[in-house]
A protein has these predicted regions:
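Bacterial N-terminal signal peptides that target proteins for export
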Residues: 1-10
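Conserved functional micro-motifs across diverse proteins
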Residues: 20-208
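Bacterial N-terminal signal peptides
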Residues: 9-18
Length: 208
């Protein structure tokens, strides 16, 4: 066994992991859009945001503290009261910090790579193929869970409908740039081509 493998095994043992790797799927049930303080309406489209960027909120939603690796998930809740289909492109969303630095979202697939269970390390703990398969199954559940909660790449907001999705940002340990940042969310009316931008300011420290 090489030094890296030994180190991984010792780490897993040290934090109390056993052969039974698992991922618990948590529900995500948004509140009525009026309940969110962080919201804005433009051209009959309302978008609210809730940063899930504390240990407690992240674990309650994703079963894992995503902030530990510097990720800040933000829940978007949307309501389209216009008569048109509205296009929201996830890659167009920007998080702008107090110094004007702009960050784009990261995909759940990139994030999952940092959190997935090390299948070989579980097997090396002495439980063989059964532990390997357990970790593999947990990784599949985690991938399905986090990707299903993620805002789709091109979200069509239908007239008189509500929808929601999570946008993930990688900000680094401690999420230093999240307080006093702003979310810029471009929208496009598909019938007219008219464009609007919703700006949501995340004031003060990340909400507890």
């Amino acid at each position: 066994m090489n030094a890296r493998a030994i180190g991984t095994v010792l780490f897993l043992q040290g934090i109390g992991l056993t052969a039974c790797a698992s991922h618990e799927i948590k529900g995500l049930a948004p509140q009525p859009i009026e309940a969110y303080l962080l919201r804005e309406t433009t051209a009959d489209v309302t978008i609210a945001a809730e940063p899930l960027a504390t240990k407690e909120k992240a674990e309650a939603t994703f079963a894992v503290d995503l902030t530990e690796q510097g990720y800040a998930p933000v829940l978007l809740v949307m309501e389209n009261r216009s008569g048109d289909n509205i296009l929201l492109v996830k890659d167009d969303i920007e998080l702008v910090d107090s110094r004007g630095n702009v960050r784009k979202s990261t995909s759940s697939e990139v994030m999952i790579e940092k959190f997935e269970h090390n299948k070989m390390a579980y097997a090396l703990l002495g439980f063989g193929i059964f532990s390997y398969m357990s970790a593999e199954e947990a990784n599949k559940k985690m991938r399905s869970d986090w990707s299903s909660k993620e805002l789709s790449a091109e979200k069509i907001l239908l007239p008189n409908r509500k929808s929601h999705g999570v946008v993930y940002f990688e900000l680094g340990p401690g999420l230093p740039t999240l307080p006093n940042s702003s979310l810029r969310i471009p929208l496009q009316h598909l019938r007219t081509g008219e464009r609007h931008t919703i700006n949501l300011r995340i004031g003060g420290p990340a909400a507890k």
